[in-house]
Curated annotation (Swiss-Prot):
It is found in: Lysosome membrane; Endosome membrane; Cell membrane; Cytoplasmic vesicle, Autophagosome membrane. Glycans are attached at residues 46, 57, 71, 97, 109, 117, 175, 223, 230, 243, 261, 276, 308, 318, 357. One of its GO terms (biological process) is regulation of protein stability. InterPro entries: Lamp2-like_luminal, Lamp2-like_TM, LAMP_CS, Lysosome-assoc_membr_glycop. Residues 27-188 are annotated as: First lumenal domain. Residues 1-26 form the signal peptide. Extensively N-glycosylated. Contains a minor proportion of O-linked glycans. Contains sialylated glycans. One of its GO terms (molecular function) is ion channel inhibitor activity. This is Lysosome-associated membrane glycoprotein 2. It is a single-pass type I membrane protein. Disulfide bonds join 38-75, 149-185, 233-266, 332-369. Belongs to the LAMP family.
Length: 411
């Protein structure tokens, strides 16, 4: 499928499918608890899926009807995220996750799974089985406001193009009543009509699954303190973003400190910080002492569940990050990447850590990550300076030699 830009000028936005205009029925979900409504959603969506057949790639558009099941949907609370889950028979399942932070909440990931064993929907498909695409959305919305968007919102993550429109959404509803205050999407503010338009052609095959056009928010910074008896022995402050590429499907997950537990331990030569929440069974950061003078991040272990329910675990005990002298802390305010394995990396933001020799529960003087860059640049600068001096000496020598030779000829 190739997506064309909306019609310019009048900005008309209409939705045309392969054989003409088709309208799907709106999906509606009103979850309640003891106070009343706790999650409200109404929207329409369809998916255009390219799948591998015997000799060529085929394309099918699935328009989701209103008669679906919502098993697994939940309202969430301050510690647990909200979730909308949809099942369309055995052909398709869809889910979106929400997390709450202070006075706002985030639409985290959209997960779509489709079953190519359904020969009616996917005739001639090879291979057969359940395939999953995960889109990290990262949209941020205020609490106490209903989000509305009549225009089409398109997520193009090969081999699936997803379209959403006619959206009315409020997660973490307060006081049991859907809000009358609205937040309208920017697409509606610039469009003169709200019916979505897409022109479709058969797409060229691709294996790229990286959602390069989808912004991911910066993670919230968390503070983690580990004690040994009555004394603080480990301090860590950082925003954490987990980047997973499993079977070419990207998964980006921001750790929310508000719903994350942590434990740890301190030994003379090693220290451990362990994080866990409803999705992460454990995420370990293990520090070690090097040459009795410095500390560094030696090991990272992770065991967690992806949005599609599959387990993911990676360990690496041969790392060398966040190196600093004992008695000091390590700090890096800019984004830094810890590559744990080919399929797993951790992006850190506003990092500060001290796993040894903590005094009075406070950070010691920090070694900044920019010092590492300075240490790298110093030899280059010294070498360049020496090279410049050598060039000047050679120039002076040749100039002197030329003058001496000229004087000899005149004599």
């Amino acid at each position: 499928m190739r997506l064309l830009s909306p019609v310019t000028g009048s900005k008309l936005v209409l939705l045309f499918l392969f054989l003409g205009a088709v309208r799907s029925d709106a999906l509606k979900l009103n979850l309640t608890d003891s106070k009343g409504t706790c999650l409200y959603a109404e929207w329409e969506m369809n998916f255009t899926i390219t799948y591998e057949a015997l000799k060529v790639n085929e394309t099918v558009t699935i328009t989701v009807p209103d008669k679906v099941t919502y098993n697994g949907s939940s309202c969430g609370d301050d510690k647990n995220g909200a979730k909308i889950m949809i099942q369309y028979g055995s052909t398709l399942s869809w889910a979106v996750n929400f997390t709450k932070e202070a006075s706002q909440y985030f639409i985290n990931n959209i997960t779509l799974s489709y079953n190519t064993n359904d020969t009616k929907t996917f005739p001639g498909a090879v291979p057969k089985g359940i395939l999953t695409v995960i889109i990290p959305v990262g949209s941020q919305l205020p609490l106490g406001v209903i989000f509305k968007c009549s225009s089409v919102l398109t997520f193009n993550l090969s081999p699936v193009v997803q379209h959403y429109w006619g959206i009315h959404l409020q997660a973490f509803v307060q006081n049991g009543t859907v809000s009358k205050h609205e937040q309208v999407c920017k697409e509606d503010k610039t469009a003169t009509t709200v019916a979505p338009i897409i022109h479709t052609t058969v797409p060229s095959p691709t294996t790229t699954l990286t959602p390069t056009s989808i912004p991911v928010p910066t993670p919230t910074v968390g503070n983690y303190t580990i004690s040994n008896g009555n004394a603080t022995c480990l301090l860590a402050t950082m925003g954490l973003q987990l980047n997973i590429t499993e079977e070419k499907v990207p998964f980006i997950f921001n750790i929310n400190p508000a719903i994350t537990n942590f434990t740890g331990s301190c030994q003379p030569q090693t220290a451990q910080l362990r994080l866990n929440n409803s999705q992460i069974k454990y995420l370990d950061f293990i520090f070690a002492v090097k040459n009795e003078k410095r500390f560094y991040l030696k090991e990272v272990n992770v065991n967690m569940y992806l949005a599609n329910g599959s387990a993911f675990h990676v360990s690496n005990n041969n790392l060398s990050f966040w190196d600093a002298p004992l008695g000091s802390s390590y700090m890096c305010n800019k984004e830094q990447v810890v590559s744990v394995s080919r399929t797993f990396q951790i992006n850190t933001f506003n990092l500060k850590v001290q796993p040894f020799n903590v005094t009075k529960g406070e950070y010691s003087t920090a070694q900044d990550c920019s010092a590492d860059e300075d240490n790298f640049l110093v030899p280059i600068a010294v070498g360049a300076a020496l090279g410049g001096v050598l060039i000047l000496v050679l120039l002076a020598y040749f100039i002197g030699l030329k003058r001496h030779h000229t004087g000899y000829e005149q004599f």
